[in-house]
UniProtKB/Swiss-Prot annotation:
Membrane spanning residue stretches: 1-21
Domain of life: Eukaryota
Biological classification of the source: Eukaryota, Viridiplantae, Streptophyta, Embryophyta, Tracheophyta
Tissues expressed in: Expressed in root, leaf and influorescence stem of 3-4 week plants.
Membrane topology recorded in Swiss-Prot or TrEMBL: Single-pass membrane protein
GO molecular function annotation: heme binding; iron ion binding; monooxygenase activity; oxidoreductase activity, acting on paired donors, with incorporation or reduction of molecular oxygen
Name listed for the protein in its UniProt record: Cytochrome P450 71B2
Organism of derivation: Arabidopsis thaliana (Mouse-ear cress)
Keywords, in A-Z order: Heme, Iron, Membrane, Metal-binding, Monooxygenase, Oxidoreductase, Transmembrane, Transmembrane helix
Length: 502
């Protein structure tokens, strides 16, 4: 029976594949260069490893635009700033939708969030809500005290390790910091108060598992339709995604139930803001929110806010310990600017140290937390650098490769913040050499919140402490192996020894 089933699947996939290959060969489009493909799977065999590095190798051989067919899904990989500008600026509207995958659909409650919602009226309304109500400058400032309190707590814990001369697991420290900030900002939940439904370690594990679920491709993603769903069912490909979703949903529901109790909305967190909007809705309103919309928006803030900021800080401190000259200059710049023996560093001090801003930019260039801009999908036929990009083509922008382009950057593999000293290049979406938050209509709305958290934490740790490798090892020997799928983090946790300076 099993042999017959396998024979049936292979035969069916071969027929389907031959149809797609025939269509591709007879295509009237001038498609970008493409590596050789195989029956059924297309170019999937080229993805043996971390995707950003696999696509990087293809771009070296085939150029800044590469056409792939992943199963039956057409994909164009963008690997230059010029091509990125053509997508994100020139053709922003035509490339403004999102491809639908099983993982993103499940965790976003059917694409009811901001990040994965397809382009249309719903996305415009929910995006407006995010920009005006949730992440406006005024709202980000209102959460300033939370960021300052949580960074103060980190400084206190690191000071305790400094007294013992014991190493600090900075990977865990940064994930704990961002989780604490986001849980208070988004959910009104404080790890340090009793009654928290999930302990902090489980929160961090859940974020990692959720990122894996979002980055786990199923047969349905590559072979849309009944056949893909059948193979997924046969091999239980949705099991892990459903398990993570079930735990996240229970967590969100617990938080919402707490907010619905009397005195449950004493904090002006994001859940409170959206529940208040739901309460004020009228029957005649054309745009209405429900609990699934709320959970989907919280999912965006919760997962993206915790993961990406922590990953950025880990890579920044990793590069600083590997480059003592840069570390020393950063500490001297911060200490000279802020003065000696400063009791507390707050967000009033942000923006005062230009060299720290250069370090952030250089970290975003070499180690973007997300090596790809969240994938886009073309809604109509467009042309990029003379090549045809048909409708319903997935666009993958490899910002990791763009940040290492030797045509745009001198010594691209070197961590050198000084390259930004006389440069106007910034990370806010107007310069296509540096795109950690994307650009155009779908730029990340949480960018101001993320930058404030990262800069405040790094400024504190570099001001109050000197840092060294444990057990007499040297920074140049540190392991730089990457891990992950959607976000790329240092595989081996970063452990450093702090020495109290002030």
């Amino acid at each position: 029976m099993t042999i017959l089933l396998c024979f049936f699947l292979v035969s069916l996939l071969t027929i389907v594949s031959s149809i797609f290959l025939k269509q591709n060969k007879t295509s009237k489009f001038n498609l970008p260069p493409s590596p050789s493909s195989l029956p059924i799977i297309g170019n999937l065999h080229h993805l043996a490893g971390l995707p950003h590095r696999c696509f990087h190798k293809l771009s070296i051989k085939y150029g800044p635009l590469v056409f792939l067919r992943l199963g039956s899904v057409p994909v164009v990989v963008i690997s230059s700033s010029e091509a990125a500008e053509a997508v994100l600026k020139t053709n922003d509207l035509e490339c403004c939708s999102r491809p639908k995958t099983v993982g993103s659909g499940k965790l976003s409650y059917g694409f009811k969030d901001i990040t994965f919602a397809p382009y249309g009226e719903y996305w415009r309304e929910v995006r407006k809500l995010a920009v005006i109500e949730l992440f406006s400058s005024k709202k980000v400032q209102s959460f300033r005290y939370i960021r300052e309190e949580e960074v103060d707590f980190v400084v206190k814990k690191v000071s305790e390790s400094a007294l013992k001369q014991s190493p600090v697991d900075l990977s865990k420290t940064f994930f704990s910091l961002t989780a604490s900030i986001i849980c208070r900002v988004a959910l009104g939940q404080n790890f340090n108060e009793s009654g928290f439904v999930i302990d902090q370690d489980r929160i961090e594990e859940l974020v990692t598992e959720s990122a894996e679920a979002l980055g786990t491709f199923t047969f349905s993603d590559f072979f849309p339709g009944g056949l893909g769903r059948f193979v997924d069912w046969l091999f239980q490909r949705h099991k892990k995604i459903n398990k993570v979703f079930k735990e996240l949903d229970a967590f969100y529901q617990h938080v919402i139930d707490d907010h619905l109790k009397p005195e449950g909305r004493k904090n002006q967190d994001i859940v409170t803001l959206i529940l208040d909007m739901i309460d004020k809705q009228e029957d005649s309103d054309s745009f209405k929110l429900n609990m699934d919309n709320l959970k989907a928006i919280v999912m965006d803030v919760f997962l993206a806010g915790i993961d990406t900021s922590a990953v950025t800080m880990i890579w920044a401190m990793t590069e600083l310990i590997r480059n003592p000259r840069v570390m020393k200059k950063a500490q001297e710049s911060i200490r000279t600017t802020l003065g000696l023996k400063k009791e507390r560093i707050t967000e009033e001090d942000l923006g005062k140290v230009e060299y720290l801003n250069h370090i952030l930019k250089e970290t975003f260039r070499l180690h973007p937390a997300l090596p790809f801009v969240v994938p886009r999908e073309t809604m109509s036929h467009i042309k990029i650098q003379g090549y045809d990009i048909p409708p319903k083509t997935q666009i993958q922008l490899n910002v990791w490769t763009i940040g290492r382009d030797p045509k745009r950057w001198n010594d691209p593999e070197e961590f050198n913040p000084e390259r930004f000293a006389n440069s106007s290049v910034d990370f806010r979406g107007q310069h296509f050499d540096l795109l950690p938050f994307g650009s155009g209509r779908r730029i990340c709305p949480g960018m101001p919140m993320a930058i404030a958290s990262v800069e405040l934490a790094l400024m504190n740790l570099l001001y109050y402490f000197d840092w060294s490798m444990p057990d007499g090892t040297k920074g140049e020997d540190i392991d730089m192996e990457e891990a992950g799928n959607i976000s790329i983090v240092k595989k081996i946790p970063l452990q450093l020894v702090p020495v109290q300076r002030y």
